[in-house]
């Protein structure tokens, strides 16, 4: 009971509650006095001579003042409470922002430390363990590969580029004499715009959603690589090996793919508009739903390719081989040229 009374008292101590209670007490007291005066004819109070209008005139001013005071205090209290809550929220937001900044800095430092440690250890393998002169079965190669595959997932997109360029410039991923096998390496979302990876061995690497626009990949080997949704716009992929690579939904607009090997590649939904695919090998490739508008496919091998739903409007198919390809006459009619092309039924277009 004592606890209940204390709780009640704490509540009425609030400014707006105190005003409201005071108002009620005053009104009740006046009502009781008036009622008693009328009932017992207290002439000395002068109550019996008062009319209802007299009482209204008498009570209206204190009631208005009391209600006005209550509303003022209530509004001020609400505004103060709102301001306090806003200050508290602002302080929480600022604290969270500082904490996030500190976390970002700490994470960035960890990534930089991991990168420098990797480069130092690879340099040690090159200088002291003769990594470059090692044979495929040598333990030093396995160590180099494990270190590479382990560090990449710990790095951000920019530092992945640093690792790849270090390997390329050190001659560790050159075609024909690759030392570090990047099959399965996590290079997803790596920022490799304008990177020079000429004749780099990237077979089986995970380059999904990587930024490779304007990259120099001429003669590189990307066979079986995951390039799903990668940005290869305007990249140089001339004579590049992309057989069985997954390039679905990728952006290869205006890319140079002349003489590239794309046999068995998955290019469903890819954007190849205005790309140079002249004399490229696209045999057995999946190009369903691909955008090949205004692409140069002159002399390209598209035999057994799946072109279902592909956009061939304005494409140059002169001299191309479409033998056994899945494509409709309506699609081919949108091409700008079919001169000397081998048609799906093995006939030659005039």
Where are these regions (language model features)?
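Intrinsic low-complexity/IDR segments
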Residues: 1-350
